[in-house]
Curated annotation (Swiss-Prot):
The active site is at 22 (proton acceptor). This is Peptidyl-tRNA hydrolase. The record marks 12 as: Discriminates between blocked and unblocked aminoacyl-tRNA. The gene is pth. TRNA binds at residues 17, 69, 71, 117.
Amino acid sequence: MTDTWLIVGLGNPGSEYSNNRHNVGQMVLDELASRMGGKFKVHKARAQVVEGRLGIGGPRVVLAKPMTYMNVSGGPVAGLCNFFDIAPDHVIAVHDEIDIPFNTVKLKMGGGEGGHNGLRDISKALATKDYLRVRVGVGRPPGRMETADYVLRDFATAEKKELPFLLDEAADAVELLMDQGLLAAQQKHHPAKA
C-alpha cells in the first residue's frame, strides 16, 4: 500500500444538485482542488479526480468526486483504492451531516453511517467501516420536512453567506487530519464545552 490519501467528496452529479446541502462534500473538494491548483479530470473509476500534493512537501493525495449518485458511491471509491493502491485507513470521506448543526465540522474514524446511504455503500464496497470521515454539519430539516427534501435543496440565503467559511474550515480539517492525525484534528475542530 502507498502513503497516498484518497479524499472523497460525496454528492450527486449534475448542475441541478451542485449547490444542494447533500453536495457539501464535493464543495469542500473544490476548495481543496483550488488550494492545490488542480482541475478535476475524468478517471476510469467513474469519478472526477485531481492528483497532487497539498502544500509544499505535503502528502500525495487523490481528490475524488464520484460521478455516480450519492447512494452508489462505493464502486468508484473501491475502484480508486484499487487503482492507486490505497488502504481504507487512508480514505477520507467528506459528507453532509444532518445530526450536526450548520457551520460545524466534526471528524471520526469508522463507526455507524447514521442513515447516510452514501457512507453505507462505501462501507460495503470497502468491506470495512474503518475509514475516516469529515462530517460537515448542515443541520436538521425544519418542522416536518422530510430529510431527503431538505438535503436535496440548496442552502438558505443566510447559510450561503457563511458557507465559504464552513468549506474553508472543512478543508482545513482534511489537511490537519492527514498532517497530524485524528486526535489533533478532533481537538481543534471539537472544542471543549464550557
